[in-house]
């Protein structure tokens, strides 16, 4: 392991982990990514990125935003429309219209969607060969006996690795979060929000024939009592992505998993009193259907995202309900800040030729800077995502724009200022 560089281990090869890896590599920081799956595999269907997230992509590495644009599907309208999916008269959705409750301007090409796997595939192609090691499930992280090696990572297959810094991008069921916060602590786990989402992709020719062009060409939120659904086009308009949310007062029945395939009848029943548009959309979904429990960190938010040379990012840090459609974008913001602070720390290591203790102190300062800059905003997103489905127009408007209009450049300036203050504090001590 090099003595004049900061070597980083990233746990998890999802969108946040690979985005972060690309940004660090572009800044000359050595990275290894460890992924428990057999290959690149992004579960889920559609995903969208808001304007702030796209700006953060460019800050991390302009190739990332270019990769997203290659797979993104433009909306026919630059307005996000919230419609009454419940009180719709008539029987044929091609001849009826859901009442527009309100709409929010997204900006030009401001909230485009894509298929998750398509985007992850584009990102993976940007990675140099050998950066990602698959079938590596993390067991523990602890200081290495030789402090020049930093942290010792033990995997469930009995192998080990070392790195100066460890970043957990391992999702909602994060092992790194458990290690960081304590396995039995309430903040170490995400908790059921008492909603689940039935998710599916409908071939666009079938959706267009059943619903009409206007209802499939752009982004809609269909509202009603105890259920609502988000629809938008993906895969260059060849598929309609559907996320149908159902309120569930019961505990999630599967202790060992948060996704399950189940009969569509429960989802059909939840939307049975809705208008013809939503009933038709549900009819077009497959049976059985993928059901996703919505877990988040709202009830027990972490009081820190870092400790020493270990930190968490993305869903591992701030798992949020998807009602804002901004969780993945918040992970990109995390990556932008982490790339910046680790680059600043690496430059100080290279110029000052610090020893192992000095390098460890700089990494700690970098991660504390990240926690200071990102955690408050990320946990606000978790809170707002939990409640937004029940809010009135004015609340939805300002909460949405608080996410979309975030000043990424100001965030990066704050990152530099906080890091320098952290380093100055280390020097005084």
Swiss-Prot record:
Active site: 199
Glycan-bearing residues: 75, 87
Binding site for FAD: 35, 48, 116, 315, 328
Keyword match Hydrolase: no
Location(s) in or outside the cell: Membrane
Pfam family, one: FAD_binding_3
Highest taxon of source: Eukaryota
PANTHER family for the chain: FAD-BINDING DOMAIN-CONTAINING PROTEIN-RELATED, HYDROXYLASE, PUTATIVE (AFU_ORTHOLOGUE AFUA_3G01460)-RELATED
Family statement: Belongs to the paxM FAD-dependent monooxygenase family.
Identification of the protein by name: FAD-dependent monooxygenase azaH
Lineage summary: Eukaryota, Fungi, Dikarya, Ascomycota, Pezizomycotina
């Amino acid at each position: 392991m090099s003595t004049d560089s900061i070597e980083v281990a990233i746990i998890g090869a999802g969108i946040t982990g690979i985005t972060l890896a690309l940004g660090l590599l572009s800044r000359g920081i050595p990275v290894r990514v460890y992924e428990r799956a057999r290959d690149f595999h992004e579960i889920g269907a559609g995903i969208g990125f808001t304007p702030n997230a796209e700006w953060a992509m460019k800050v991390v590495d302009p190739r990332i935003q270019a990769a997203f644009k290659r797979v993104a599907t433009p909306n026919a309208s630059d307005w996000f429309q919230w419609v009454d999916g419940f009180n719709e008269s008539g029987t044929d959705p091609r001849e009826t219209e859901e009442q527009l409750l309100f709409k929010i301007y997204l900006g030009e090409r401001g909230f485009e969607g894509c298929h998750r796997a398509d985007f992850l595939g584009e990102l993976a192609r940007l990675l140099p060969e050998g950066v990602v090691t698959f079938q590596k499930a993390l067991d523990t992280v602890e200081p290495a006996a030789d402090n020049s090696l930093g942290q010792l990572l033990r995997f469930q297959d009995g192998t080990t690795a070392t790195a100066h810094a460890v970043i957990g991008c391992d999702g909602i069921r994060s092992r790194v979060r458990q290690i960081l916060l304590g396995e039995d602590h309430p903040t170490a786990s995400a908790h059921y929000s008492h909603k689940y989402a039935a998710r599916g992709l409908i071939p666009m020719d079938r959706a267009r024939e059943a619903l009409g062009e206007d209802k499939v060409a752009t982004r809609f939120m269909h509202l009603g009592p105890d259920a609502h659904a988000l629809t938008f086009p993906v895969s260059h308009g060849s598929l309609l992505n559907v996320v149908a949310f159902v309120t569930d007062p019961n505990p999630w029945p599967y202790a060992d998993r948060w996704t399950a395939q189940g009969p569509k009848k429960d989802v059909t029943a939840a939307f049975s009193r809705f208008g013809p548009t939503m009933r038709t959309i549900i009819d077009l979904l497959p049976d059985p259907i993928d059901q996703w429990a919505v877990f988040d960190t709202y009830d027990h938010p972490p009081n820190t995202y870092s400790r020493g040379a270990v930190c968490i990012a993305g869903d591992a840090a701030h798992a949020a309900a998807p009602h804002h459609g901004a969780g993945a974008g918040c992970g990109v913001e995390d990556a932008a800040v982490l790339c910046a602070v680790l680059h600043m720390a690496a430059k100080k290591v290279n110029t000052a030729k610090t020893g192992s203790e000095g390098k460890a102190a700089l990494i700690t300062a970098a991660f504390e800077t990240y926690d200071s800059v990102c955690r408050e905003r990320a946990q606000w997103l978790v809170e707002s995502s939990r409640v937004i489905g029940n809010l009135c127009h004015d609340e939805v408007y300002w909460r949405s724009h608080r996410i979309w209009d975030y000043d990424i450049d100001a965030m990066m300036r704050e990152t530099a200022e906080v890091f320098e203050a952290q380093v100055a504090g280390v020097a005084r001590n």
